[in-house]
Amino acid sequence: MKEYNVGPNGAQIIAADLMALNIDEMKEIIESMESEYVIFDTPGQMELFVLRQSGKFLIETLGAEKSIIGFLYDPVISKTPTGLISLMLQAASVQVRFNVPFLNILTKTDMLQDEERDTILKWGANILDLEEAIQSEVPTLKSQLSIEFLTALRSFGASQNIIPVSSMYGSGMEDIYTTAQQIYFGGEDLSKG
């Protein structure tokens, strides 16, 4: 921030653009790793990655054909039906923008009660359960709009499993690995290639 004389938002934009400018060096480092896969976290809010050309450039340059995007679901927002639908809409937008395999990941599940986590996972796996939860609420403009969005998401095929993860408990990474195996190798162990 000091070097470029910008605030936090400007620094995040510059960080995203610097990643694109230094892509060859980053690609070299990634390719030199003795790892079957690399998790690549992008700076700042998703808008910096999704809505700027540098995000698409990063995926294309690093290899869209071997990329998977993990969309992170906030646990607090996901606890309500309308909150989850809002996140599903954002996820669908990212999926349309990049058109690569996609994982829905519920983060910080240690912040949720078991029942809350299970409800979110059930809603993600079955849109009809989510619609039922909305319809059980007092009808409002927000709930009606959510049902309309849900109809669009259903036609888009947005009903997908959500993978719960917790860094506090170290849970969920094996599920992400297994899902990546399913996507690219039909369940076989990942291999460099």
Give, region by region, the residue ranges found by the protein language model.
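Expand to "…catalyze enediolate/carbanion chemistry for C-C bond making/breaking, isomerization
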Residues: 17-20, 27-28, 84, 157, ...
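Nucleotide-state-sensitive switch-loop elements of NTP-binding domains
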Residues: 1-57, 63-68
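Conserved GTPase G-domain signal focused on the G5
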Residues: 168-184
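Core catalytic machinery and nucleic-acid-binding channels of phosphodiester-processing enzymes
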Residues: 33, 37-39, 68, 74-76, ...
